């Protein structure tokens, strides 16, 4: 918060925001501002994220929606007194919000204490159900695929997705002893191989029903043979993965997926590829943390930190939208915030006042390389989508 005091004394920073120094907020003003949110819960912020999600759907018009659900640990281990900073599974004290992504966009989040595990209560089912209902009521009835890791493997979740929501899912499975024993008894001839660029897997698929389940589900066992750089892995360090999915099992949902142009998702190889893309999806966590600059939240009160976290998430969604709507010809869509700042924010400029106007002056090289005129034009005319309220 002290950085606000430094910026308040920076006339150039104030001018860049089209403010005068006396209009800039101090650290005490920001603390008073966030204190207003102590009694404000998650719901109002989640409503804003949902509206932005619907806006992006109408802008990008996807025929198939792939959601990714996971928790993100915010390491606040240095905090001496901070509400809801509790031990996490990463053996660090902090917060552990539940997050749902569509591509790079954070479309829903539930701010939670650090000790609250992935599949706590019915949080995940309610969050997914809320998004699915919004998609169907305010966008269109398109196939939805949900990607999760083994922390969300639960028969209750699966039945909710299959029977209530009517969506497809790909979920990492837990490595139970009887399952591993079954796989070890299989012959090499029963395995098939799949490679994606330099990465290679051996896999086998079968129907599996755990003791507490009342139905069989499609299960795929894969073992990673080579790393992304093509390096072969020794037998004792190979990564084994179980995957559960209803793609190809639920005939009605699979047919809708094929009609929407997703016939390739029915293949075992594509399911393995999607499941292992969860690791890439987790790079969204890195992007959010890098966007913020650090993982520590600044306040002692949970309500103030909650508001701070949601403002960060909303800003990150708008940042991702800006890269695609305004800066797509200038900077890669998948660049991290540090690269974005270095190329599109941290460049030399001069602010001069002439008459009653402030003028931002840059060199000719920056003007042409960053296409300042085009950025200015697109920033002033953002894409508009007709959204049903």
Which role fits each region the language model picked out?
Residues 1-48, 102-106, 136, 144-146, ...:
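Short, positively charged, Gly/Tyr-enriched micro-motifs
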Residues 318-389:
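A short, flexible helix-boundary coil/loop motif
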Residues 87-139:
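Electropositive, glycine- and tryptophan-enriched low-complexity nucleic-acid-binding patches
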Residues 168-283, 287-290, 381-389:
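An anionic, glycine-rich sequence signature occurring as long contiguous blocks
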